[in-house]
């Protein structure tokens, strides 16, 4: 800054063709932060240059005084212009430090869906945050979300979420940020809770003091599970059962395993000598809750794999239980045949040879109604059973009656 001294008699001189740069008197008013300074606007310096030029035209002591007043007014004018510029810059919002704030909603939704694919609770410690540090409500849901790590399906690397805003990026929110920085994460809270609501029933159980305790539970592909499967899982965990008891196992749901079991069941049933209708009626004897007798067509459709997949899965454990009971009874019959042969053994048809038959006809011609002693003697002579001889004489009398009746007509 070039101006004459108050004690000198030289006129104020200004270089031709050069612009005047006024040094700010109070530099603190011209900067918004310790590391940045605001330049002085050209509009603030142009009145000062004209004033200084006028002051430099005078000579003598009066001219020196005029120059001094012009310099003072120039400084005050530039200070006023710089102050207004500083106030204008201070009123502007700080540039957002959230570099992901401008992303579209589709990218956020895709990031949320990717993070909620595989949810496995591995940490039992709570990360407590002060109320001003987090946009979420400090309730049980919040603590449960903090203890659930999300595994990315693309990278297969587990990253535990210590803050809910980590899904939108890996940066941290500080308490001096503006409220509009937290608005995307408040919208993210609702969508994330919607994705994680089935997992809360699996990975969190209420402790004795009312706090939510994260428990390790397997919940694969929660985003793609149907509501009935999730309800079955929730019911299983409510009763204290492991997760694999409340859902269908992969072995039961495999069509190849169902086909192999149906073929094995059919072969075992044929070997045991049991019909499909017998199997359907015997299911009621198993005393399984909610299971009664089934029709023969249902068993036939199971063996031919024409039932629906869900019905095949539901019917497999029932038929497997019946097959185990049937094979157990069959083994008992083999070990103790005397307990079962008397009632189940079918009597063979009696066949009498021709010589014995002619002798019986001769005895019948002499005495159609022999006494019991006579029947015993004939049986002993012909080497036949007494009951066989008695039945033959009875049948022969019925035959003679039919012949007489047909001859009389």
Swiss-Prot record:
Residues 91-237 are annotated as: Required for transcriptional activation. It comes from the Eukaryota. The keyword Repressor applies. Residues 345-404 bind DNA. Residues 31-52, 153-166 have a biased composition (Low complexity). The keyword ATP-binding does not apply. PROSITE patterns: HOMEOBOX_1, HOMEOBOX_2, POU_1, POU_2, POU_3. Residues 53-69 have a biased composition (Gly residues). Residues 250-327 form the POU-specific domain. Residues 238-409 are annotated as: Required for DNA-binding and transcriptional repression. Residues 26-93, 153-188 are annotated as: Disordered. GO terms for molecular function: DNA-binding transcription activator activity, RNA polymerase II-specific; DNA-binding transcription factor activity, RNA polymerase II-specific; DNA-binding transcription repressor activity, RNA polymerase II-specific; p53 binding; promoter-specific chromatin binding; RNA polymerase II cis-regulatory region sequence-specific DNA binding. Residues 170-184 have a biased composition (Basic residues). A motif (Nuclear speckle targeting signal) lies at residues 171-185. A motif (POU-IV box) lies at residues 110-119. Interacts with POU4F1; this interaction inhibits both POU4F1 DNA-binding and transcriptional activities. Interacts (C-terminus) with ESR1 (via DNA-binding domain); this interaction increases the estrogen receptor ESR1 transcriptional activity in a DNA- and ligand 17-beta-estradiol-independent manner. Interacts (via C-terminus) with TP53 (via N-terminus). Interacts with DLX1 (via homeobox DNA-binding domain); this interaction suppresses DLX1-mediated transcriptional activity in postnatal retina enhancing retinal ganglion cell (RGC) differentiation. PANTHER family: POU DOMAIN (PTHR11636), POU DOMAIN, CLASS 4, TRANSCRIPTION FACTOR 2 (PTHR11636:SF41). Tissue-specific DNA-binding transcription factor involved in the development and differentiation of target cells. Functions either as activator or repressor modulating the rate of target gene transcription through RNA polymerase II enzyme in a promoter-dependent manner. Binds to the consensus octamer motif 5'-AT[A/T]A[T/A]T[A/T]A-3' of promoter of target genes. Plays a fundamental role in the gene regulatory network essential for retinal ganglion cell (RGC) differentiation. The N-terminal transcriptional activation region is sufficient to induce transcriptional activity. The POU-specific domain and POU homeodomain regions are necessary for DNA-binding activity and transcriptional repression. This is POU domain, class 4, transcription factor 2. The gene is POU4F2.
